[in-house]
Amino acid sequence: MINRDNKKAITKKGMISNRLNKFSIRKYTVGTASILVGTTLIFGLGNQEAKAAENTSTENAKQDEASASDNKEVVSETENNSTQKNDLTNPIKKETNTDSHQEAKEAPTTSSTQQQQNNATTSTETKPQNIEKENVKPSTDKTATEDTSVILEEKKAPNNTNNDVTTKPSTSEIQTTPTTPQESTNIENSQPQPTPSKVDNQVTDAINPKEPVNVSKEELKNNPEKLKELVRNDSNTDRSTKPVATAPTSVAPKRVNAKIRFAVAQPAAVASNNVNDLITVTKQMITEGIKDDGVIQAHDGEHIIYTSDFKIDNAVKAGDTMTVKYDKHTIPSDITDDFTPVDITDPSGEVIAKGTFDLNTKTITYKFTDYVDRYENVNAKLELNSYIDKKEVPNETNLNLTFATADKETSKNVKVEYQKPIVKDESNIQSIFSHLDTTKHEVEQTIYVNPLKLNAKNTNVTIKSGGVADNGDYYTGDGSTIIDSNTEIKVYKVASGQQLPQSNKIYDYSQYEDVTNSVTINKNYGTNMANINFGDIDSAYIVKVVSKYTPGAEDDLAVQQGVRMTTTNKYNYSSYAGYTNTILSTTDSGGGDGTVKPEEKLYKIGDYVWEDVDKDGVQGTDSKEKPMANVLVTLTYPDGTTKSVRTDANGHYEFGGLKDGETYTVKFETPAGYLPTKENGTTDGEKDSNGSSVTVKINGKDDMSLDTGFYKEPKYNLGDYVWEDTNKDGIQDANEPGIKDVKVTLKDSTGKVIGTTTTDASGKYKFTDLDNGNYTVEFETPAGYTPTVKNTTAEDKDSNGLTTTGVIKDADNWTLDSGFYKTPKYSLGDYVWYDSNKDGKQDSTEKGIKDVTVTLQNEKGEVIGTTKTDENGKYRFDNLDSGKYKVIFEKPAGLTQTGTNTTEDDKDADGGEVDVTITDHDDFTLDNGYFEEDTSDSDSDSDSDSDSDSDSDSDSDSDSDSDSDSDSDSDSDSDSDSDSDSDSDSDSDSDSDSDSDSDSDSDSDSDSDSDSDSDSDSDSDSDSDSDSDSDSDSDSDSDSDSDSDSDSDSDSDSDSDSDSDSDSDSDSDSDSDSDSDSDSDSDSDSDSDAGKHTPVKPMSATKDHHNKAKALPETGSENNGSNNATLFGGLFAALGSLLLFGRRKKQNK
C-alpha cells in the first residue's frame, strides 16, 4: 500500500505466504462519472499481474482573467523513466484510467456545467485565452492556427484552492515542429492550475497487509544496493522539485484487497490420481469485489471472489490431484498472460498442494505434496479472484457464474456493466490499458476516438505520459510511460455498419480498416507526448498504443498514461475530453519512512504425551509411566484451518511456524482403551496434564509445556445364569437345574452386537473385557421352553426376561439371569359320523365313518399333519403347542356334508374346514357328519320293455326329475301305455305294470330303461321321464310332434300293431326322433324307441321345461281296447305333429 502523504513505499521483510502481485486498471471519475476499476489479479510470488480499472473524473475548472503582467511560465512535463522505489518484493500494481475534457473560453470564466450526452459523461467548457491550438486542421482564420510546439503547463495546486488560468489567443504563427521543452508559446499563468478532482484509472494489486516482503537479512548484508533501494524515496522526490500539478488524495487510486491462493505446477515425479471424491467442501460462496449489488463493474476492476473451505480425507496421498474450476466467462488475470496459480499453504507457510492452470478449460489442477502424508485431518481454505473475460463477454449482459471445488458447484447471478465515453460537445473518448507485458516492460492502451460517431471538427488526440483530467487538464499522477519515436501507434477506422465492443478490448484488429498512414502522427509532440491529427471526422476510430515503462525496485509498477480529444465546437472554441489509465503495483506495507521492517519471528508449541499409570495427572511419579506413541494431536489456526500430527516413539509432538500474539488450539485424541488423566494435577506447568484440549496464545516465545496423560481403562465382566423354572414362579430354587446351550447376545448402548455366547452345562454364561457403560443382554428361548415370569424377587435370584439392560460402573455385573419352563403339549381331534337322519347331530344309533382323511395346518397354512379316522370314525393330532390351527375334512365319496353347528359344540358337525385355537388345553370338539342321498332301485325290469324306450329314457335323463319318483308312477302310467306297446311285445310288459307297482320305486324301472341312467335312479324316473313323458307329453307333444312326423308314419304305427308305439310315443316323445320311431314303427317297438331315443337326446335337453305335465294313470289293464288304440294313437300322433311343428317354429324364432 502506498503512503499517500509521503509518497513513499516501505517493504516488509520475512516469509511471504501465498502472495500474489495484483495489477489494477482503474478509471476514477469525480462528479458525474462513476468510478471504474478494471481488474485485480493475484499471482504467484514474484509474478506480476495486472488489474485494469477505468476511472473517469469530471472537473469544473474555474478560470479567471489574469493580467497581462502575469508571469509567463513554460512548464515542460518530464517523466523520470527510471524512477527509484523502495525495494518491494511483491508489488501491487494499479492501473488508473482518467478521462477529462475541457473547452477553453475567453477571459471571464464561467463555471463549467456537466452535461450528459448519449449516456456519457460531459465536462466543462471555457473560452480559449491565448492557448495554443493543438494540431487543429488548418484554417484561413488566424484564430484557428495550430501550434505544434506545445508546452504543457502543469502546476502544483494547493489543496482546497481553485486555480484560474487566463490565456489569450496567440497572433504568432505556430511552429510546425515542437521546440525544446523550455520554449514558451504565449501561455500565461495567473494562478496555479486547478488540481483535477478526477482520478485516473488505477489498478491496485492488493496483498494481505500482514504479509512481509521476502527479503532476508543475509540478502541485505550481501547486497548493499538493495538496502539503498529499500530506503530510497520514490521518484516523488524528484517530482517535488518540479512545478507540476499533483493529483489530490481524494482521487488517489483505490486499493482492492483481493487474496488468491493457488499454486504452481507440481513436478511430475509422483503418479497422479484424481481424488475429487475424497474432498469434502464444507462451505463455498461467490461475492463481488467492490459492492455486493449484483453488478460487476468490469472496467472498474471489480473482481469476483470465490471462496471455498474443504476437508482433505486422510486417504489422500502425495501426488494425488484435485481440481478447481472457474466460470467460463471469467479469467484469473485481466491484462497479463501469466495465469500461474500459487501454492495452497497452511497458515505457517507449509505447502499443501501446487497447481497448474489450463486456459482452455479455465481449470486449476492441484497436486498434493507429502504434507498430506505427514499430517492428518487437514482442512484448507481457497480464495480465488477472477475478472470478467472480455473476450467471452464483449458487451454488457447478465451472467450466471458457476465455480466448483472438486466438482462441487456453487452459482451466482450477476450483471456485467462497462464504462461509457467522456463527452464534451463533439469530443468523446474512452480508453483502457488492454495488456501488460512485465517481461518487455510494455503496456498496450486501446483508445476509442469518437465512439458516438459525431461530426467532430478539427479533431486531435493527444497521448501523454501521466494524467489527463476529464476536462482535458494535464496533471502528474501516480505513474508514467515512455512515449517517443519507438512507441507503436496504430489507427483503425470503424465502418459505419460496425459496432465497437463495449468491453473496449479488441482481439482482432484485422476486421477494421488500418488508416495509420492516413492521419498525421507526431510522436515527439512534447516530452513523452504524441499527437494524432484526424481533421474533420464523423466515424469512430480505434487507436492502439504500445509504450514502454520503467519498472521500479523489485518490479514495482507506476504506469500512467492519459489521452485527450480536442475538437472545435460550433462557437469555434476548443472542447476537450480526457481519459487516463493507470497501473500501480506496490507492496502492502503499513506506510513509514522506508526503513526495513524487522523480520517477523515465528514460534513453536508442543511437547509430550505419556501413560499415567497411577492416574495422578503428574509426569514421573511412577516408574512404570512411559511415553505414548502414535497419539493424534490436532492444531487449529486462528482462521479455523487445521492440521494433525501423531506423537513419535518418545511421545513428542511439535507445531512450528506460529505467529506472535495469535491464539491456537491443540486437541489430543484419546487412544483406544485409555482415558484422559486428571488435569492440572500440579502447579508445575511442565509436569502436569493439560487435558484433551488446550488453548494457547503465543507471547513472544515458544511454549513447549502442552502435555497430556492417559491411563488404561479398566475392564469388567457381565453375566450369570439361565435355569429351568420347574414351578414357574420366576425365582431360582435350589433344586432347579441350569439349562445348557442357551444363546445369549450382548449389545452396546448403540445397539451394536459386541458378543455372543451360550450357557455351559450349569446354565452359566459371561462376557469379559468390558468398559464402563450400558449394555443390552438378549436370551434366546430354548426349543421346547417358555420364558417364566420376570422381576419377581431380588435381582440376583429373579428372572430378567428375554431382554434386559446391564450397567457396568467400575465393577462386574453378575445379576443378569433368565428362567424358562418346559412348554406343555396339547391334542386336537374327535369324530366323523354317518348322519343317517341328516339332522346334523350325533345320535347314539349313528355310526362313525372309517378312513376319512383329516389334514391339520398351522397358522401359516403349512400342513403339519394328516391322518384318517379309525373304524369308529375317531381321529386326533398330538404334541401341539398353543396356537391357531385349521382342520380340513375330506368328503367321502358318495356322501353329502350334513348341516353344521346345529347343536352343542361336542355333538354337532363343524363343516369341511374348521379354524381352531388351542390355549393351554386340548380340544376334542372338532367333528363332522355326512349322509347318503336317496337312490331308487332299478326294477330295471319293469321297463326293461320300455327299455326299448329306455333310450328314450336316456332322454328322460331329465329323469333325474325322476326323483320325483312318485311321478314316475305316473310314468308308470305311461308305462302302462308303453305296455300297450308292450302289448305288441308281451304282456310281460304288463309286468311293467308291475313296474307301475314298482312305481313306488319311482319306477326307477324306467331305470331299467336306461340302465346307463341307471345310476340316475332318477332315470328310473325316466319313467318319471315318462313323467317327463308327461313332460314328454308336452314332449310327447313334441314327440308326438316328432311322432307326428313319424306318426304320419306312425300311422303306420297303427301298423305297428302296438300303440305301444304310440306309447312309446311318450317315449317317442322322448323325442322327435320318434320320427324314426314312426319309422321303426315297425311296432316291433323294437323301435324300442331305443332307436328313437337316440334322437331323443336333444329333446331331453328341453325336457325340463315340461316336467310339470300330468301323470298318466298308474298302470292299468290294456282292456281299454286294442281296437281303439290304433285310432287314438293316430289322432294323438297327428295332434302331436301339429304341436311339434308349431313348437319348433317357435323355437326357431
From Swiss-Prot:
GO terms for biological process: cell adhesion. Changing I698N: In strain: 80s-2. Residues 903-913, 930-1088 have a biased composition (Acidic residues). It is found in: Secreted, Cell wall. A motif (LPXTG sorting signal) lies at residues 1112-1116. Keywords: Cell wall, Peptidoglycan-anchor, Repeat, Secreted, Signal, Virulence. It comes from the Bacteria. Residues 109-126 have a biased composition (Low complexity). Residues 61-75, 92-106, 130-145, 216-241 have a biased composition (Basic and acidic residues). Residues 53-601 are annotated as: Ligand binding A region. The keyword Ligase does not apply. Changing D616V: In strain: BM12987 / O24. The modification Pentaglycyl murein peptidoglycan amidated threonine is found at T1115. GO terms for cellular component: extracellular region. It is a peptidoglycan-anchor. The keyword Phosphoprotein does not apply. Residues 77-89, 158-205 have a biased composition (Polar residues). Residues 602-714, 715-824, 825-935 form the CNA-B domain. Changing T595S: In strain: BM12987 / O24. Residues 1116-1149 form a propeptide. InterPro entries: Adhesin_Fg-bd_dom_2 (IPR011266), Adhesion_dom_sf (IPR008966), Fibrogen-bd_dom1 (IPR011252), Ig-like_fold (IPR013783), LPXTG_anchor (IPR019931), SDr-like (IPR050972), Sdr_B (IPR033764), SDR_Ig (IPR041171). Belongs to the serine-aspartate repeat-containing protein (SDr) family. Specifically interacts with bone sialoprotein (BSP), a glycoprotein of bone and dentin extracellular matrix. Could contribute to staphylococcal osteomyelitis and arthritis. This is Bone sialoprotein-binding protein.
